[in-house]
Regions:
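Structured cytosolic domains appended to multi-pass membrane proteins
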Residues: 1-109
Length: 109
């Protein structure tokens, strides 16, 4: 794994979600990529999306690239409908961990 990278797995639906768990990773020094594995997120509501958007804003402020992988159909639809896919950038949605890690390596500091 690239030394500049943090990987966090979100488990379960993102309803009434809080950002505290994965935002804690943004305090690590010398890290400029946060990869979120979302394979085990079958569903997301607006509060889950707001949590993800808050994480994205925090990452932007700290110069951290946010990458997502294994995003399921329903959460992806919520993200698309709300404009989050466009905001984050389609290129930051990765098919699997190998693709995400390879992309993270291009941001090595």
């Amino acid at each position: 794994m690239p030394r500049n990278t943090m990987v966090y797995e979100i488990l379960g639906p993102m309803f009434f979600a809080e950002t505290n768990d994965y935002l804690a990773f943004t305090h690590e020094k010398h890290k400029n990529v946060l990869i979120l594995r979302m394979r085990d997120v079958p569903a997301m509501d607006i509060t889950g999306l707001e949590s993800l958007e808050e994480a994205y804003k925090t990452c932007q402020k700290k110069g951290i690239h946010l990458l997502l992988f294994h995003v399921n159909e329903q959460p992806r639809h919520v993200m698309e409908k709300a404009g989050f896919v466009e905001k984050l950038g389609e290129e930051n949605f990765c098919e699997n961990i190998d693709v995400a890690l390879a992309k993270a390596a291009t941001f090595d500091n």
